[in-house]
């Protein structure tokens, strides 16, 4: 019986040793899995943080670029407003010239624009009241001096222009209003105006 007890005890001891070895191996594997999981989590965390940092840098760059673009747009808009104001002031100055001087400028413009000498002149309602009674007669004299048959007429019609005139020949109208002239000349002189203003 004592031999059976010894065998039984030995089997139990081996089973215990085997169980302890299995437990130890399982604990080591669990520790290894936990360590690898922690390393992987740390790597993912670092990756996520790096990605977030890069996205933050990208967002910052985009915001900066947008802000710079907006600032440039506002600067250009402000510059455009100043240039517009300069051209508008030119029209205002022309319109506020003394009547005699204004009439002389318009008269010279008409003489330089006429081709046949039988065109009609259309003015704004304000300018029609502003010109002297001999305005058309003086233009026709100047045309005759240039060798053009001076038969210019002042049209009954008026146009809503701030200054200048419209030259009408049959169905054709040539817009010589200050706005139209400034608009045409603006492209030619705008760069110089910008250089002078800024």
UniProtKB/Swiss-Prot annotation:
Cysteines paired by S-S bonds: none
Keywords linked to the UniProt accession: ATP synthesis, Hydrogen ion transport, Ion transport, Transport
Any single GO BP term: proton motive force-driven plasma membrane ATP synthesis
Keyword Transport: yes
GO cellular component: proton-transporting two-sector ATPase complex, catalytic domain
InterPro entries: ATPase_E_C, ATPase_V1_Esu
GO molecular function: ATP binding; proton-transporting ATP synthase activity, rotational mechanism; proton-transporting ATPase activity, rotational mechanism
Function: Produces ATP from ADP in the presence of a proton gradient across the membrane.
Family: Belongs to the V-ATPase E subunit family.
Protein's recorded name: V-type ATP synthase subunit E
């Amino acid at each position: 019986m004592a031999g059976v007890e010894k065998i039984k005890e030995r089997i139990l001891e081996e089973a215990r040793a085997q169980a302890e070895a299995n437990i130890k191996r399982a604990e080591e594997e669990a520790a290894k899995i936990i360590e690898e999981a922690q390393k992987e989590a740390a790597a993912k965390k670092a990756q996520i943080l790096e990605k977030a940092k890069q996205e933050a840098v990208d967002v910052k760059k985009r915001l900066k670029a947008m802000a710079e673009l907006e600032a440039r747009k506002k600067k250009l808009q402000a510059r455009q407003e100043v240039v517009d104001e300069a051209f508008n002031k030119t029209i205002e100055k022309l319109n506020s010239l003394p009547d005699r001087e204004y009439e002389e400028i318009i008269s010279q413009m008409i003489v330089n624009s006429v081709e046949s000498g039988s065109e009609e002149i259309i003015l704004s309602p304000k300018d029609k009241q502003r010109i002297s009674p001999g305005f058309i007669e003086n233009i026709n004299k100047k045309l005759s001096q240039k060798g053009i048959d001076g038969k210019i007429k002042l049209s009954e019609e008026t146009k809503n222009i701030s200054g200048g005139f419209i030259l009408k020949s049959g169905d054709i109208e040539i817009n010589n209003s200050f706005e139209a002239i400034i608009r045409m000349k603006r492209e030619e002189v705008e760069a110089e105006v910008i250089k002078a203003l800024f």
